Amino acid sequence: MEQKDFIFITGASGIGKTTLAKGLLQHYRTTCIEQNMIPEFISRDGSEPMTGELEELTCWENLVAMLMCFHKLGYKNIIVSDIDDLRTADIPVVFKGKKYITIKLVSTDPEQIRKQMENRPENGLIDYELQEKMNAKNLKRDPLINEVEIDVAGKTSEEVLKQAIALIDTEIPLLEYDYEKPPRALFYSWVFANGLR
């Protein structure tokens, strides 16, 4: 089994990222970190209004710091989910030299993931138009460094988990590479100011 330092899970809202992360956590028995797992913050100085860009940047920088802390302490197969898709392009920059894999979940059956979103527990985001746009962008974009794609269409969550584990355990990540970030237009972002929704 090829242990990784980091396992990133990306994909459209409602496609099964959280379900996969929970399954991987049970399998690898390590740790799972989501970008939204940071302390509550309202502004930097008590008066400055919070912008979407600053909020996302704060979440991203905090996530990277947490991940590097766990890595420094010797954790392996650190599962990372729920990052802004635009940050997917930063993974090969920030984590170069580390053993990581990015699992991009897509669906060639938009109706399947629409139904998954419809049945989301805990009042998760329900926005079918955004989900469709996110998935379409992910289907069009070529894989990045150390990124693999799993089409969830027609698969149960158990089948997706099994496929993900097989990829994680066998894929050998590149540690050294040349990388040029793809155009921003190939990604989506929950930050309205990025203009990628």
PLM regions with names:
Residues 12:
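P-loop (Walker A) phosphate-binding loop of NTP-binding proteins
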Residues 58-96:
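Glycine-rich phosphate-binding loop used to anchor ATP phosphates in small-molecule kinases
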Residues 97-117:
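Conserved phosphate-donor/acceptor-positioning beta-strand/loop module used by diverse small-molecule
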Residues 122-163, 172-193:
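Small-molecule kinase domains that catalyze NTP-dependent phosphoryl transfer to phosphate-bearing small molecules
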